[in-house]
């Protein structure tokens, strides 16, 4: 089922999400939420989605793609379901990059993010996940996990000369919503 995506200004996006409780692991309810999130993400051409964006207060993010029309120059990111994540930078190197968000439609901005990270958490059955990521993969993970602490990417922008409407900044980029 395609779910509605909350938009910036909805106070539910500002909440800190609690961890997915142990009793939900492996449940049909959790699997339905994950299936709905993937269907929703694909429907709008996104590269990631966090449960709070669909109004569910849980530490759950999904991300991954082979090729993205929204980010045509980005390298592929493996499809991942990540619960109760922890992100640790593995170097102090920070990289600026353009970001958009399904909850901030039609806009893009340059956001600084750690270039190299380790992310940990669990999968829907409770098995541990421990991965290293860099570049766009690291950016996507950090962006999605920000939603779990009630943070949207515009709050991380340092130069508002590099923030605006996608259609103005990137004419001809075909995206249904940004």
UniProtKB/Swiss-Prot annotation:
Alphabetized InterPro entries for the sequence: Peptide_deformylase (IPR023635), Peptide_deformylase_sf (IPR036821)
Gene coding for it: def2
Record-linked SUPFAM superfamilies: Peptide deformylase (SSF56420)
Biological process per Gene Ontology, one example term: translation
Binding positions (Fe cation): 101, 143, 147
Name listed for the protein in its UniProt record: Peptide deformylase 2
Family stated for the protein in its record: Belongs to the polypeptide deformylase family.
Keyword Iron: yes
Tagged with keyword Membrane: no
Catalytic residues identified in the record: 144
Free-text comment on the cofactor: Binds 1 Fe(2+) ion.
One of the record's GO molecular function terms: peptide deformylase activity
Organism for this UniProt entry: Pseudomonas putida (strain ATCC 47054 / DSM 6125 / CFBP 8728 / NCIMB 11950 / KT2440)
Necessary cofactors: Fe(2+)
Keywords carried by this UniProt record: Hydrolase, Iron, Metal-binding, Protein biosynthesis
PANTHER family (alphabetical): PEPTIDE DEFORMYLASE, PEPTIDE DEFORMYLASE 1
A UniProt-annotated Pfam family: Pep_deformylase
Function field: Removes the formyl group from the N-terminal Met of newly synthesized proteins. Requires at least a dipeptide for an efficient rate of reaction. N-terminal L-methionine is a prerequisite for activity but the enzyme has broad specificity at other positions.
């Amino acid at each position: 089922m395609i779910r509605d995506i909350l938009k910036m200004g909805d106070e539910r996006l500002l909440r800190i999400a609690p961890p997915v409780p142990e009793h939900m692991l492996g449940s049909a309810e959790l699997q339905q939420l994950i299936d709905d999130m993937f269907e929703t993400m694909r429907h709008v051409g996104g590269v990631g989605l966090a449960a709070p964006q669909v109004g569910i207060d849980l530490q759950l993010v999904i991300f991954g793609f082979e090729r993205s029309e929204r980010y045509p120059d980005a390298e592929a990111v493996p499809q991942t379901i990540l619960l109760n994540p922890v992100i640790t930078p593995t170097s102090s190197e920070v990289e600026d990059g353009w970001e958009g968000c399904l909850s901030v439609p039609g806009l893009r901005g340059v956001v600084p993010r750690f270039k190299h990270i380790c992310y940990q958490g669990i999968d829907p059955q409770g098995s541990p996940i421990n991965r290293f990521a860099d570049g766009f993969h690291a950016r996507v993970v950090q962006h999605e996990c920000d939603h779990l602490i009630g943070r949207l990417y515009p709050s991380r922008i340092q130069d508002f000369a590099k923030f605006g409407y996608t259609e103005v900044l990137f004419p001809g980029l075909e995206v249904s919503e940004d």
